[in-house]
């Protein structure tokens, strides 16, 4: 079975149930959530996440595994502000606890961190320090380090940087990788013409068994732009053919694929989610040039 879905919202009273219902409405077989707002530290208690009802709905609809995304305010790469680093460590610990409580997520996707001017080596050492403070040998969820585009002072823009972080961490069996197609393309890897070559390179440097999550996004920018701006499937510089190849790649069949493509529409208050139609299009093997209009008409 193709494990494909998108980022969905966990909110209101229904929480996990709402997320599962949204995913099922898109024809998804997996999904990704934040356990609270990604831009702040306010979190509902675990008891209010409506886990049991959510899991029951997932089971009824054949969804076995979901992904959690850590909030992007976490920066364990910060060497200049001890309070930012400490917030990242404490918050990541809490996210591991919350994700474990869900019982259906094995991976927490984490942007490795930004060195904020101290240089990549210093940032990487700080990320290692943070992960060593957080990870325990008996935890049941992995931290999936996301491949980054190289915007600003981001660490993790190359497979070598990801490998360096993993190598420095004591309990690194608790680390995996989230391969983001837009980020990897924007970082300079040629996933359009030579994805198999890129995957082989990843295998040599990091190890393909570490690749446990895929973020499937097209890119608004040319390869190597270092920008990180997602585009709808087939409407960017990566293109439908390459993304379809990645989604159906025989070596990655078991890996959950998560769409983080933009909502569609000119009116900011009335943008439509693209995921149902993008998932259908990735399943059926044919690019639909009229897709954006169909999404708007939903």
Curated annotation (Swiss-Prot):
Binds 3 Zn(2+) ions. Its cofactor is Zn(2+). It catalyses: Endonucleolytic cleavage to 5'-phosphooligonucleotide end-products. It comes from the Bacteria. InterPro entries: AP_endonuc_2 (IPR001719), AP_endonuc_F2_Zn_BS (IPR018246), Xyl_isomerase-like_sf (IPR036237), Xyl_isomerase-like_TIM-brl (IPR013022). Its EC number is 3.1.21.2. Zn(2+) 1 binds at residues 69, 111, 146. GO terms for molecular function: deoxyribonuclease IV (phage-T4-induced) activity; DNA binding; DNA-(apurinic or apyrimidinic site) endonuclease activity; phosphoric diester hydrolase activity; zinc ion binding. Disulfide bonds: none annotated. The keyword Acetylation does not apply. Keywords: DNA damage, DNA repair, Endonuclease, Hydrolase, Metal-binding, Nuclease, Zinc. One of its GO terms (biological process) is base-excision repair. Zn(2+) 2 binds at residues 146, 180, 215, 260. Zn(2+) 3 binds at residues 183, 228, 230. Belongs to the AP endonuclease 2 family. Endonuclease IV plays a role in DNA repair. It cleaves phosphodiester bonds at apurinic or apyrimidinic (AP) sites, generating a 3'-hydroxyl group and a 5'-terminal sugar phosphate. This is Probable endonuclease 4. It comes from Bacillus cereus (strain AH187).
